[in-house]
A protein has these predicted regions:
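Short, well-ordered beta-strand elements within core beta-sheets of diverse protein domains
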Residues: 35-41, 56-62, 147-148, 258-261, ...
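Rossmann-like NAD(P) dinucleotide-binding subdomain of oxidoreductase/dehydrogenase enzymes
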Residues: 124-268, 322, 394
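Conserved C-terminal structural/oligomerization subdomain of aldehyde/semialdehyde dehydrogenase
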Residues: 31-37, 222, 259, 357, ...
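ALDH superfamily catalytic-core signature
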Residues: 232-374, 437
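Structural signal for hydrophobic packing residues in well-ordered secondary-structure cores
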Residues: 57, 61, 76-83, 87, ...
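Hydrophobic face of amphipathic alpha-helices that form TPR/SEL1-like repeat modules
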Residues: 1-30
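Residue-level signal for inorganic ion chemistry
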Residues: 32, 68, 90, 112, ...
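Glycine-rich loop-to-alpha-helix module at the N-terminal edge of alpha/beta enzyme cores
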Residues: 33-122, 133
Length: 479
């Protein structure tokens, strides 16, 4: 029996062998086999990485932005060269289907190239002064050392979402991947090492969030911590960062509503909502978690929805290419989904499809449709993060908007209608960072991914996401 590979960290331009005794097993969620081990890193490891990033930052910032962009393009080229290898790692450690893993890797390379294009485009300002002979200059400066704490659902892309704008604008970064999906991050670090990126500009630390994450947020040398994860984890990061008044950028949970109007294209709505719910086995914070259907089409829509969900195939993504879903990430995730469905049933919901975990190896949960659901049920308010879809009927658009907004979360929302006036009313009424009209919930790199309320602070992507990594210096120049 082969011994699982033991991965090192990447600090100050070197792969660092772990000298500690404690290791964390990385498990294939499709088979429950241990596929690798990573160090159970401690705060001291994070401090070393932060110190390396601090040493490297002034010289990195001094480079012209276009030169920093050229390094990003070398990274994206390396990703494309290793695309098949990286996709396989994502499938193995994350349970993601092959097609989605391939999309994630390709999108990551494209995203890095997109951010590199901003090298000549982010600007300061010259402002008219009230004083004779004075110029007011606004410069955009790097923050300094930044840190990125990643989730496991889109682990490879999230490296780029934090690293690319940080490095492009003259910051350095320390990345901590999820302990459930670290192998793809090791592959990323190997690319960084192979292209010869200056030491300390990019660092990778491995371990648990509750130990390393606290140092990445609480170290006084850190200028900004960017985290993607749960609300509870975000609260801890925010509290720790507050001790040094450190800037935070948080993308947290979601409970995305999808509103289906009487005049909707039902074929489009059903396909988009099902695709949005089963993608990555429902483990996506911005995809539809609850559906509101106007009463005039409720029966017809629910019948079509049930047929579409029944047709969804799932299994081991390493063995099958004809599936739309793999397993959930781990045993704890499977148990949480089971508990949320059980509670919904206790509160009066009816399981129309699915509703029971699959027996045997792997953390599989089938597409599940819940009917006879009421707005006050917990399943309409708590994030499920699994392939479970509760459906509620409504009379008027105003009622649907009111129920959609009745949430602690405010990340994404969607509406299906062929009436422009209805769509515009929904856009104005829905209190979410993103609203999708007649399409699945998946953002664009040139947009801005940002949640309201408990879904987060700050945002990512596009011009506005780039500016999260900049601070403004004002100069009053009297001649």
């Amino acid at each position: 029996m082969s011994v699982p590979v033991q991965h090192p960290m990447y600090i100050d331009g070197q792969f660092v062998t772990w000298r500690g005794d404690a290791w964390i097993d990385v498990v294939n969620p499709a088979t429950e086999a241990v596929i690798s081990r990573i160090p159970d890193g401690q705060a001291e490891d994070a401090r070393k990485a932060i110190d390396a990033a601090e040493r490297a930052q002034p010289e990195w910032e001094a480079l012209p932005a276009i030169e920093r962009a050229s390094w990003l393009r070398k990274i994206s080229a390396g990703i494309r060269e290793r695309a098949s290898e990286i996709s396989a790692l994502i499938v193995e450690e994350g349970g993601k289907i092959q097609q989605l893993a391939e999309v994630e890797v390709a999108f990551t390379a494209d995203y890095i190239d997109y951010m590199a294009e901003w090298a000549r485009r982010y600007e300061g300002e010259i402002i008219q002064s009230d004083r004779p002979g004075e110029n007011i200059l606004l410069f955009k400066r790097a923050l300094g050392v930044t840190t990125g704490i990643l989730p496991w659902n889109f682990p490879f892309f999230l490296i780029a979402r934090k690293m690319a704008p940080a490095l492009l604008t003259g910051n350095t970064i320390v990345i901590k991947p999820s302990e459930f999906t670290p192998n793809n991050a090791i592959a990323f670090a190997k690319i960084v090492d192979e292209i010869g990126l200056p030491r300390g500009v990019f660092n990778l630390v491995l371990g648990r969030g509750e130990t390393i994450g606290q140092e990445l947020a609480g170290n006084p040398k850190v200028a900004m911590v960017s985290m993607t994860g749960s609300v509870s984890a975000g609260e801890k990061i925010m509290a720790t960062a507050a001790k040094n008044i450190t800037k935070v950028c948080l993308e947290l949970g979601g409970k995305a509503p999808a509103i289906v109007m009487d005049d909707a294209d039902l074929e489009l709505a059903v396909k988009a909502i099902v695709d949005s719910r089963v993608i990555n086995s429902g483990q996506v914070c911005n995809c539809a978690e609850r559906v509101y259907v106007q009463k005039g089409i409720y029966d017809q829509f629910v019948n079509r929805l049930g047929e579409a969900m029944q047709a969804v195939q799932f299994g081991n993504p390493a063995e099958r290419n004809d599936i739309a879903m793999g397993p959930l990430i781990n045993a704890a995730a499977l148990e949480r989904v089971e508990q949320k469905v059980a509670r919904a049933v206790e509160e009066g919901a009816r399981v129309a499809l699915g509703g029971k975990a699959v027996e045997g190896k792997g953390y599989y949960y089938p597409p599940t449709l819940l009917l006879d659901v009421r707005q006050e049920m917990s399943i309409m308010h708590e994030e499920t993060f699994g392939p479970v879809l509760p459906v509620v009927a409504f009379d008027t658009l105003e009622e649907a908007i009111s129920m959609a907004n009745d949430s602690d979360y405010g990340l994404t929302s969607s509406i299906y209608t062929q009436n422009l006036n209805v769509a515009m009313k929904a856009i104005k009424g829905l209190k979410f960072g993103e609203t999708y009209i007649n399409r699945e919930n998946f953002e664009a790199m040139q947009g801005f991914h940002a949640g309201w309320r408990k879904s987060g602070i700050g945002g990512a992507d596009g011009k506005h996401g780039l500016h999260e990594y900049l601070q403004t210096q004002v100069v009053y120049l009297q001649s």
